[in-house]
Regions:
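Extended, charge-rich alpha-helical interface modules
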Residues: 1-56
Length: 56
């Protein structure tokens, strides 16, 4: 897997997490712990994307 492939894979995962957060937030009784966990995952992925983009 090339560096650009890895970045694209991470971007796809980042979008997927954003969609999961949106779904959870719009539920009648959203689980804040789940939302926090998803946001942490999303931030870690964003940090990795930025780091990889600086090395590309």
């Amino acid at each position: 897997m090339t560096l650009l492939d890895r970045i694209e894979t991470l971007r796809t995962r980042h979008r997927s997490l954003e969609e999961a957060i949106d779904r959870e937030v719009t539920r009648p009784a959203p689980n804040m712990e789940t939302i926090s966990d998803l946001k942490r995952q999303k931030l870690r992925i964003k940090d990795e994307i930025v780091q990889l983009e600086h090395t590309a």
